[in-house]
Regions:
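S-adenosylmethionine
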Residues: 1-278
Length: 278
């Protein structure tokens, strides 16, 4: 297995996303500074804000009042690559705790239908709380196992699969990962789970729709090799380049784009955007 990177992502700052229902990223920076944040400025990813707080961001009145949510810049980039639009039907198949779902519904202008799924009620409750705090009306948190067909899910214009993974790209945030041995059986289980969720997404996506697969690992078996295997099973899909500009240092290849913290300043992260051609 590849070792992860313990490099501190986002310059050691907290990466945020402004709630467009309450103002622009620039206005959020002003409010953060006025409320006691040490620093607040635009980040690398369009619409992101990097801030330094005296304590936890969750202690901020602006957080409690739904002015922003916390989401790493690399994670924001993955959600932006979905290119969700107002009026779309969008699925977020591995949505908890809900940060990417919030960004998706922001991109949709809180118009259309976003179904945000996760495997347990406890995890779905995290999504509900985040959506309620931010004040969005068109998000449907739902318990659903992405590895299995779910007849209650709608056909979608776009789908995000931020898959369960080994987490080797975020050691700075979760250093305990480095002390956990990822045995071959567990690694194989992760690969099978990722594969099953991708197959579920393929069946739920409309022709012409966008599928984004992402992980917070740098392991090729979970990233480029997983995408290559998916494309071999599903020749109706092709890799596409999203409209959003990738930050400097991203490695872009045939089967996706990789962020390595020491090169991009963001978390270790992988994403691949695909289109269903028929």
């Amino acid at each position: 297995m590849l070792l992860g990177y313990a490099h501190t992502a986002d310059g050691g700052l907290t990466s945020l996303r402004a709630n467009p229902l309450k103002g622009t990223p620039e206005a959020l920076c002003e409010k953060l500074l006025a409320s006691g944040a040490k620093t607040a400025a635009p980040g690398l990813v369009p619409g992101s804000v990097l801030a330094r707080f005296e304590g936890s961001p969750a202690e901020s009145g602006l957080f409690r009042d739904g002015y922003f949510h916390v989401e790493g810049q690399a994670s924001q980039l993955a959600a932006l690559c979905v290119e969700a639009k107002p009026g779309d039907t969008v699925l977020d198949l591995c949505a908890a705790p809900g940060g990417k779902s919030l960004l998706l519904i922001e991109e949709m202008g809180d118009e259309g239908r976003l179904v945000s799924c996760d495997v347990s009620e406890n995890r779905v409750q995290l999504i509900r709380k985040a959506v309620e705090r931010m004040g969005f009306a068109h998000v449907e948190p739902r318990v659903s196992d992405g590895t299995k067909a779910d007849a209650d899910l709608p056909m979608a214009d776009a789908i995000l699969v931020d898959a369960p993974c080994s987490g080797l790209g975020i050691l700075a945030k979760k250093p305990d990962i480095r002390y956990k041995t990822l045995e071959k059986a567990r690694h194989d289980e992760l690969l099978a789970t990722q594969s099953s969720i991708l197959d579920t997404a393929a069946a739920l996506l409309k022709a012409g729709g966008r599928l984004v697969y992402s992980t917070c690992t740098i392991d090729p078996a979970e990233n480029e090799e997983q995408v290559a295997a998916f494309l071999a099973r599903h020749p109706e899909f092709r890799v596409v380049r999203p409209a959003v500009a990738f930050p400097d240092g991203m490695t872009v290849g045939e089967h996706g784009a990789l962020s390595v913290p020491t090169r991009t300043g963001m978390d270790g992260f992988f994403l691949c955007a695909m289109q269903k051609t028929q």
